[in-house]
């Protein structure tokens, strides 16, 4: 029997049964990972990280390093691969960690200094709460933001620079634009890149 999400947030250590995937044969990059409870003894509330890469994030990398952003305080941390239990089941991510995750820009995002944002990304909890917008400098960054948030957030929304919604995903499914609009856009793209606006 799975424990309720709120109980897991800092009161009891996450274990292998809380993971969707475990072992060395999986890629960790772009997923919420669970650090072993003994990495930070007495602080089981700091086990969840968004994996940003590292040579240890690749499959079958036993003692190489894994980089991650804490979903408790936003600090960047490095681990040995052997210190990672696995990837968290998305439904077990606590609300506060979802809000922290929503503020992380996609892996490989351009620095905001010297690059003008074209889109903003928002991720919402089921009750409508959100932390703040995340600036995104390209269509690729915008789509990467949606893909990294989609498994964990209730609603993900992309807006253009004028803050008009150009894409909305609810419960992992795109609801705007609908499939008919997408087919029309793909027909107009003529093999080139589609614009979200």
Regions found by a protein language model. Give the residues of each.
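A short, charged, amphipathic alpha-helix used as a generic interaction element across diverse proteins
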Residues: 125-128, 133-160
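Charged, amphipathic alpha-helical segments
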Residues: 44-51, 102-107, 137-146
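Short beta-strand-centered aromatic/proline hotspots
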Residues: 32, 42-59
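Residue-level signal for glycine
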Residues: 73, 82, 122, 128-130, ...
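Intrinsically disordered, low-complexity, charged/polar segments
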Residues: 65-104, 173, 178-179
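Short aromatic-glycine-(Arg/Gly/Cys) micro-motifs in beta-strand/loop hairpins
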Residues: 106-131
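Mixed-charge, Lys/Arg-rich low-complexity intrinsically disordered regions
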Residues: 1-36, 97-105
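Non-Sec secretion/translocation targeting segments of pathogen effectors
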Residues: 187-197
């Amino acid at each position: 029997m799975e424990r309720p999400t709120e109980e897991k947030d800092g009161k009891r250590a996450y274990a292998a049964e809380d993971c969707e995937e475990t072992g060395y044969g999986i890629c960790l990059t772009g997923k919420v990972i669970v650090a072993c409870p003994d990495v930070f003894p007495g602080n089981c509330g700091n086990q969840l990280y968004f994996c940003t890469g590292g040579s240890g994030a690749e499959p079958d990398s036993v003692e190489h390093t894994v980089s991650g952003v804490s979903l408790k305080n936003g600090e960047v941390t490095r681990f040995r691969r052997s210190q990672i239990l696995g990837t968290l089941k998305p439904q077990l991510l606590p609300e506060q960690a979802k809000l922290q995750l929503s503020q992380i820009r996609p892996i490989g995002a351009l620095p905001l200094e010297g690059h003008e944002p074209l889109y903003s990304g928002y991720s919402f909890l089921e009750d409508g709460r959100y932390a703040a917008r995340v600036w995104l400098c390209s269509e690729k960054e915008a789509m990467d933001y949606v893909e990294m948030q989609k498994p964990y957030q209730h609603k993900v929304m992309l807006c253009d620079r004028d803050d008009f919604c150009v894409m909305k995903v609810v419960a992992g499914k795109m609801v705007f634009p609908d499939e008919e609009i997408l087919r029309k856009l793909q027909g107009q793209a003529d093999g080139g890149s589609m614009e979200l606006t």
